[in-house]
């Protein structure tokens, strides 16, 4: 695939990701897609800049309900994770887990609806599964 075609594929994947209401249900498919796309092409210039500005090691938070504790989407702020933890009003109140990560663990940073979301690939999940810390 040519460089231009790779960039187009990344932009289409990004459009699908940012419009998807439930990325959790297709984690395996998204992981497969991300393995074929350069994150530089997936992120917008402002997102790449924001990711570059982060320290090498930082905290991320995941808000979840029910069985969705392990996932691809993490927030940079506890407030954003709290929102994610309670999106579905038909489910019991959710929880938030926190994890310290390095930039090398991050696939991409996406500014979606004003929330900074970190997308972490499947390798991250297996690497950090045993050190999740409940924060509430």
Model-derived regions: residue spans:
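Conserved NAD+-utilizing ADP-ribose enzyme module
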Residues: 1-58, 63-72, 76-136
């Amino acid at each position: 695939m040519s460089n231009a075609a790779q960039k187009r594929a990344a932009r289409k994947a990004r459009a699908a990701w940012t419009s998807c209401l439930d990325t959790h249900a297709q984690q395996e498919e998204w992981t497969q897609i991300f393995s074929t796309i350069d994150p530089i092409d997936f992120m917008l210039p402002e997102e790449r800049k924001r990711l570059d500005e982060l320290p090498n090691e930082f905290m991320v938070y995941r808000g979840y309900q029910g069985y969705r504790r392990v996932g691809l989407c993490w927030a940079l702020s506890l407030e954003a994770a709290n929102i994610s933890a309670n999106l579905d009003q038909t489910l019991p109140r959710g929880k938030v887990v926190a994890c310290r990560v390095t930039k090398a663990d991050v696939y991409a940073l996406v500014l979606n609806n004003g929330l900074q979301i970190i997308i972490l690939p499947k390798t991250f999940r297996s690497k950090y599964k045993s050190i999740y810390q409940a924060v509430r």
